[in-house]
Amino acid sequence: MTTFLAKNWSSLIKPTKVQYEAVDNNPNIKTMVVEPLERGLGLTLGNSLRRVLLSSLRGAAITSIKIPGVEHELSPVSGVKEDLTDIILNIRDVIVKMDSVQKCNLRLEVTGPAVVTAGMITVTDKQDVTILNPQHVICNLSKGFNLEMDLICEQGKGYVPTSCLHNSDSPIGAIHLDALFNPVRRVSYKVENSMVGQMTNYDKLIITVETNGVVNPDAALGLAARILLDQLQVFINFQEVEEEKPEKLELQTINPVLLKKVYELELSVRSQNCLKNENIVYVGDLVARTETQMLKTANFGRKSLNELKKVLANFNLEFGMKDIGWPPENLESLAKKHEDQY
């Protein structure tokens, strides 16, 4: 494949940072900000990630229960305040984390009076299984009654109805539950403008993810991105051209803003003329000089200095910067490559 075709993706601006912020101090809800993105890619990536997050991540869920003397969902449960439908709904909300096994047996055995909670569930197989919401109420048991329940917990992805879970291995008398395996509860996103230099025609993707605690939100987003990457690989039907590594490495070590030409900074005419007379072409030339050196420039006063300081601050730059690798040996070729990309 030619370098010309490779520019279809290599010339696009790429995100330089991802910011993570917890919402309401809840570690299970995070907002992630990604910028800058090419115009339109914010919506494309946001929608794709949201769909994968809500459909394709794996988790664990209780898929069936068995209570002695109870044959179906409409049967009464002796000594329990709630009917079986409410009990099933409460059991579906039990959050189970299991990493090393695909399926395990759980046991619930309580003597009343008691408020039966998820923390009373025990693992009969001695597997590495954790109940993440032990205070979650399942039912209320009256005095003088016992409640025994065998539960099966399985791994899966997405949402699976009871009709797809029933199989020949199910114990007689087992009641199957709709299983929501996905650890992601809610996903929302929005796209705003992002600024690169003085240009605002780029996208900023703001995506908020809420999970049940089995996986944290930023890890869930990473898994969704990995799923998309894996699925899209099949469409790449060409060999990529290897870039020149030395130049690529050098470009990565230099702040790309330093390769901008000063005329792109939208300065006053007076400041532009002063920089031109001093042969200051790139932003790198500018920040390599000290304020004292700049004030010695003909027709360059404190007002022009303050103007430049304000502009540089927008890029987190200042006068007198050292150890910035300026000027690079192949300045012209790097600057040309920078222009092609931006």
Curated annotation (Swiss-Prot):
<keyword id="KW-0240">DNA-directed RNA polymerase</keyword>
<keyword id="KW-0548">Nucleotidyltransferase</keyword>
<comment type="function">
    <text>DNA-dependent RNA polymerase catalyzes the transcription of DNA into RNA using the four ribonucleoside triphosphates as substrates.</text>
</comment>
<dbReference type="InterPro" id="IPR011262">
    <property type="entry name" value="DNA-dir_RNA_pol_insert"/>
</dbReference>
<keyword id="KW-0804">Transcription</keyword>
<dbReference type="GO" id="GO:0046983">
    <property type="term" value="F:protein dimerization activity"/>
</dbReference>
<dbReference type="InterPro" id="IPR036603">
    <property type="entry name" value="RBP11-like"/>
</dbReference>
<dbReference type="Pfam" id="PF03118">
    <property type="entry name" value="RNA_pol_A_CTD"/>
</dbReference>
<dbReference type="Pfam" id="PF01000">
    <property type="entry name" value="RNA_pol_A_bac"/>
</dbReference>
<comment type="similarity">
    <text>Belongs to the RNA polymerase alpha chain family.</text>
</comment>
<dbReference type="GO" id="GO:0000428">
    <property type="term" value="C:DNA-directed RNA polymerase complex"/>
</dbReference>
<dbReference type="InterPro" id="IPR011260">
    <property type="entry name" value="RNAP_asu_C"/>
</dbReference>
<feature type="region of interest" description="Alpha N-terminal domain (alpha-NTD)">
    <location>
        <begin position="1"/>
        <end position="239"/>
    </location>
</feature>
<dbReference type="InterPro" id="IPR036643">
    <property type="entry name" value="RNApol_insert_sf"/>
</dbReference>
<dbReference type="GO" id="GO:0005737">
    <property type="term" value="C:cytoplasm"/>
</dbReference>
<dbReference type="GO" id="GO:0006351">
    <property type="term" value="P:DNA-templated transcription"/>
</dbReference>
<dbReference type="GO" id="GO:0003899">
    <property type="term" value="F:DNA-directed RNA polymerase activity"/>
</dbReference>
<comment type="subunit">
    <text>Homodimer. The RNAP catalytic core consists of 2 alpha, 1 beta, 1 beta' and 1 omega subunit. When a sigma factor is associated with the core the holoenzyme is formed, which can initiate transcription.</text>
</comment>
<keyword id="KW-0808">Transferase</keyword>
<protein>
    <recommendedName>
        <fullName>DNA-directed RNA polymerase subunit alpha</fullName>
        <ecNumber>2.7.7.6</ecNumber>
    </recommendedName>
</protein>
<dbReference type="InterPro" id="IPR011263">
    <property type="entry name" value="DNA-dir_RNA_pol_RpoA/D/Rpb3"/>
</dbReference>
<dbReference type="Pfam" id="PF01193">
    <property type="entry name" value="RNA_pol_L"/>
</dbReference>
<dbReference type="GO" id="GO:0003677">
    <property type="term" value="F:DNA binding"/>
</dbReference>
<feature type="region of interest" description="Alpha C-terminal domain (alpha-CTD)">
    <location>
        <begin position="254"/>
        <end position="342"/>
    </location>
</feature>
<dbReference type="InterPro" id="IPR011773">
    <property type="entry name" value="DNA-dir_RpoA"/>
</dbReference>
